[in-house]
């Protein structure tokens, strides 16, 4: 996989989505010399970070014909990780002290993340490449090129041919629903975190929240402010778990998984506890879903594994004309988007070559066999966990990009440890000022900020 000889080839590329992945993909593709068109159905950049109070009429997302609301952001959402490790490599996510309307907290709100993405788009003139209010209807291979059919908000249709398509459309819109024995006869209401915005609808209810990571931890505590009782069912908990959690209203309990649901409205947990619940909130993640993508049955999503996909990016027989940015689940999301985009851009230009189709398929076969031997379920194929930095550094070496910084890696590790150990307070109480200082000193050394790090470090929480 050595660098290929010149000349550099300029491709006509469609990027699907103008969220955090699509924005940096567009920048990297243009930097590499490609012509780029970004297609996005919304009126502004930001993707899932654009908050809307609207939710889908089908709260479980079971109706394939439903109008889809792509945002999953709830009103009280703050980031799960420190801001300094979230940003792109050369555009740090630092406080904007010159603007009093901005959120300078280390774990800021979703509004601040959106503002950061808007700043990024402005800084690199990305909006000039974007067609807003454009819904992609179909993407398919045609004679070695890619046909993209779309329609605008005004009803105009487009049928265009591109050299390549980069999929940056996210994977937080198709809810994954827990399978519970007896749920079909249970009379209560069910919803998914995708449709959660504010706690008000749960006032005085007994609520069961399934899942206790990130959104589950947040939403259960948000609901506890108004609910009568909140009971969290967690697959990670031992079977006999029954623990009261410290929240102001003293009304939050942690359980093991749900065992059964019953027509009398009761929910039975595997710890033997029984509650009569009004609502179940599924905080159980999302499915990968690409309804407009036609690959002549070459690709599929099987048990939430997108396959075949070399290094989570390239479908071997369709590469490099089709690629995916942002599929792996990891802490360093924006950074990953940037590194993956650099690789895609370099491959499309011919500056970096991919292995042969057979070599990529052999690599995938070995990867899947290793995963199975380790007992890792297929549905976790795109969850990189502790191997995320190894993955990113491997791609970085291909593109001549620096490895993940020590402070960035450790902020993610320690940040998630705090989330698990102190879910009520982790955003405002931390013990890694050394890493934060290292990050800001790094930004200053690279001339990425125009103020001394102490200005923020001494400002407190």
From Swiss-Prot:
Taxonomy, superkingdom: Eukaryota
Record-listed NADP(+) binding positions: 211-216
Disruption phenotype annotation: No visible phenotype in leaves or seeds; due to the redundancy with other FMO GS-OXs.
Induction per the UniProt record: Up-regulated in roots by salt, osmotic and cold stresses.
UniProt xrefs under Gene3D superfamilies: FAD/NAD(P)-binding domain
Binding annotation for FAD: 17-22
Record keywords, A-Z: FAD, Flavoprotein, Monooxygenase, NADP, Oxidoreductase
A Pfam family hit: FMO-like
Catalytic activity: a (Z)-omega-(methylsulfanyl)-N-sulfo-alkylhydroximate S-glucoside + NADPH + O2 + H(+) = a (Z)-omega-(methylsulfinyl)-alkyl-glucosinolate + NADP(+) + H2O
GO BP of this protein: glucosinolate biosynthetic process
An example molecular function term from Gene Ontology annotations: flavin adenine dinucleotide binding
Enzyme Commission code: 1.14.13.237
Similarity-based family: Belongs to the FMO family.
Free-text function comment from the UniProt entry: Catalyzes the conversion of methylthioalkyl glucosinolates of any chain length into methylsulfinylalkyl glucosinolates.
Name of the protein: Flavin-containing monooxygenase FMO GS-OX4
Gene, per the UniProt record: FMOGS-OX4
């Amino acid at each position: 996989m050595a660098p290929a000889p010149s000349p550099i080839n300029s491709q006509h590329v469609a990027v699907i989505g103008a969220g955090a992945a699509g924005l940096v993909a567009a920048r990297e593709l243009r930097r590499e010399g490609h012509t780029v068109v970004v297609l996005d159905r919304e009126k502004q950049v930001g993707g899932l970070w654009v908050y809307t109070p609207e939710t889908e009429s089908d709260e479980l997302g079971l109706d394939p014909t439903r109008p889809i609301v792509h945002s999953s952001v709830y009103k009280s959402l703050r980031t799960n990780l420190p801001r300094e490790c979230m940003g792109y490599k050369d555009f740090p996510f630092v406080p904007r002290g010159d603007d009093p309307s901005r959120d300078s907290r280390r774990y800021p709100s979703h509004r601040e993340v959106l503002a950061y993405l808007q700043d990024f788009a402005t800084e690199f003139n990305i909006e000039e490449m974007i067609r807003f209010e454009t819904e992609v209807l179909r993407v398919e291979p045609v004679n070695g090129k890619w046909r993209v059919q779309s329609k605008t908000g005004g009803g105009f249709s487009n049928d265009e041919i591109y050299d390549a398509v980069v999929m940056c459309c996210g994977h937080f819109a198709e809810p994954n629903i827990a399978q519970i024995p007896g749920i079909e006869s249970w009379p209560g209401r069910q919803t998914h975190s995708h449709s959660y915005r504010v706690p008000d609808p749960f006032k005085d209810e007994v609520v069961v929240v399934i899942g206790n990571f990130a959104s589950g931890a947040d939403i259960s505590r948000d609901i506890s402010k108004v609910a009568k009782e909140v009971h969290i069912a967690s697959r990670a908990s031992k079977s006999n778990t029954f623990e009261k959690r410290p929240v102001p209203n003293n009304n939050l309990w942690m359980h093991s998984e749900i065992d059964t649901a019953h027509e009398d409205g009761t929910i039975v947990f595997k710890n033997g506890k029984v509650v009569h619940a009004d609502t179940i909130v599924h905080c159980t993640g999302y499915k990968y879903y690409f309804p407009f993508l036609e690959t002549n049955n070459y690709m599929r999503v099987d048990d939430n594994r997108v396959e075949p996909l070399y290094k989570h990016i390239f479908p071997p027989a369709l590469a490099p004309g089709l690629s995916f940015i942002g599929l792996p689940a990891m802490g360093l999301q924006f950074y990953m988007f940037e590194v993956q985009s650099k690789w895609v851009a370099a491959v499309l230009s011919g500056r970096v070559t991919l292995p042969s189709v057979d070599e990529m398929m052999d690599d995938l076969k070995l990867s899947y066999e290793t995963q199975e031997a380790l007992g890792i379920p297929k549905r976790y194929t795109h969850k990189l966990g502790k191997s995320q930095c190894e993955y990113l550094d491997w791609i970085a070496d291909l593109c001549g990009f620096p490895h993940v910084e020590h402070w960035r890696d450790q902020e993610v590790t320690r940040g998630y440890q705090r989330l698990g150990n102190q879910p009520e307070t982790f955003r405002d109480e931390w013990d890694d000022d050394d890493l934060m200082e290292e990050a800001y000193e790094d930004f200053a050394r690279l001339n990425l900020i125009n103020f001394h790090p102490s200005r923020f470090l001494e400002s407190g929480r």
